[in-house]
């Protein structure tokens, strides 16, 4: 046991990783964490105030967080995605006079209800997917489903953001094109595969990467 403790102590406190040791790495990460919290907490507080007290109109952006937000099903995927995105996304939509309404472990029925309810003007979908669909917590939602519900809802006048892979699929139309009244406001990634770093970037910057890729893609049409 003493040998094990001694070895652990060596690797944590004495061994150098390049020109720095574990203690220096830990202190650096700790400092970064506190700097991030210094920004995150005030931004979250501001978002809560604007979303719940300042905005009066019942106009919403629905944010559908699938249980498959990262990889395989994980109950904590939705809460983690919420914590990471709440300040930036709420302030983004609040600046456009929309409140945010988060759906944890969102289902196919949640998506259908959002389409039908006219108070939802913008839609954000987080989870596995493609250009023709999105994997809700309970089942896959596709262009076929949206076309089946067409007579139940009016097209949305806000924005569509889909944080998922954007592989080519069965139909030429993106699923968002069937929902929104302006296809130029249907935002999705340009590559076949979208990584976690891309999701994180858009979570903390208010969709800047996705909007950049979409606008660049639209210019080449």
Task: Name each model-derived stretch.
Residues 15-38:
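N-terminal Sec-pathway targeting helices
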Residues 121-133, 176-186:
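Active-site microenvironments of hydrolase-like enzyme catalytic domains
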Residues 68-71, 107-108, 128-133, 165-170, ...:
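Solvent-exposed loop/turn segments at secondary-structure junctions
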Residues 1-10:
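N-terminal targeting leaders characterized by basic, low-complexity, disordered sequences
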Residues 45-47:
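Boundary at the C-terminal end of the N-terminal hydrophobic targeting segment
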